Design a protein with these regions (language model features):
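Conserved catalytic core of nucleotide-sugar-dependent glycosyltransferases
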Residues: 107-188
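N-proximal low-complexity "stem/linker" segments adjacent to membrane-targeting elements
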Residues: 1-59
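Short beta-alpha junction loops
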Residues: 48-53, 105, 130-135, 199-200
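A structural signal for short, well-ordered beta-strand segments and their strand-loop junctions
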Residues: 100, 126-130, 193-198
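Active-site-proximal specificity loops/subdomain of glycosyltransferases
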Residues: 46-96
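C-terminal catalytic/acceptor-binding lobe
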Residues: 7-30, 176-272
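Short beta-strand-to-loop acidic/aromatic patch adjacent to the donor-nucleotide binding site
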Residues: 93-106
Length: 272
């Protein structure tokens, strides 16, 4: 893979029934949205937990000329069970930017180039857009050009580099495959995380998790790390601990133009 091929990869956390036709529509919307934004072909990794869904997914992907390489991991299981067995994770080290997203999350308003710029400028490990339809109010609290630095980010849509992606894999636990509670402990793990509220995604479907099982697994996950409850975590690690106005007018950031941007005497190079 040449250096010109590795700017961006779309990572679909998991996909399958129910509602597969609708989820494929969301996926197609997101892929087209991103291509219209970055104007460059890119690759995709998919975790598919339902064999019956693989063919219609591949058919849709093959209809999109801008999707270059398709890597599909087919296995029955829940999120962490799929990730821990995905044979394609090694290729992720070749990519500058990994766009991690759930199958029922739709992009509403986003500029990938600007999101990357924010991540690099502020040295953020886990960066999320505003999430409409999530659980917590602080994920959608603001509607303007602000960044919320966070100890807790709901895991719907995150921008990573490879090292950040591996951090995310590492903090997950096979005994907590639904991932509940992992988002609460980003401050505990000392992972610099933030929400950029000017861009948004929307959670389009109700959770398919088994709430009783997932909740019990979360309680164990938190207890093993010294926390009695969600409230206990939030008392020690405030979900949003700092809000700043994003200091850049993004109208000048043109996609895929070589551009050096100076922030506090630090040179940031985008679109190498």
């Amino acid at each position: 893979m040449s250096s010109t091929d590795n700017f961006f990869i779309y990572y679909l956390a998991a996909i399958g029934n129910p509602n597969i036709d609708y989820k494929i529509k969301i996926l197609k919307h997101n892929l087209c949205y991103i291509f219209n934004n970055i104007k460059k072909p890119y690759d995709i990794i998919i975790n598919c937990y339902d064999d019956d869904c693989a063919l219609p997914i591949e058919t849709m992907l093959n209809s999109l000329s801008f999707i270059r390489n398709i890597f599909i991991h087919k296995k029955k299981g829940i999120l962490v069970e799929l990730w821990n067995t995905n044979p394609h994770h090694d290729i992720l080290k070749n990519y500058e930017n990994i766009f991690f997203i759930l199958d029922d999350v739709k992009i509403i308003n986003m500029n990938i180039i600007n999101l990357i710029f924010i991540k690099k400028t502020f040295n953020i490990s886990f960066l999320s857009p505003k999430v409409i339809g999530g659980t917590w109010d602080y994920m959608r609290k603001y509607n303007n050009n602000v960044i919320g630095f966070a100890n807790n980010i709901e895991i719907f849509c995150l921008l990573f580099d490879y090292n950040d992606f591996m951090k995310f894999m590492h903090i997950n636990d096979i005994n907590n495959p639904w991932t509940w509670g992992v988002d609460l402990l980003l401050g505990y793990y000392n992972i610099k995380s933030a929400v950029y509220y000017n861009f948004s995604v929307k959670h389009m479907l109700p959770s398919n998790s088994n709430h009783g099982i997932a909740g019990g697994q979360m309680a164990t996950y938190l207890n093993e790390r010294g926390f009695k409850s969600v409230n206990d975590v939030n008392e020690k690690y405030k979900p949003i601990y700092k809000i700043i106005q994003c200091p850049y007018p993004f109208s000048s950031l043109l996609p895929f133009k070589r551009k050096r941007l100076l922030y506090k005497n630090k040179m940031i190079l985008l679109n190498k």
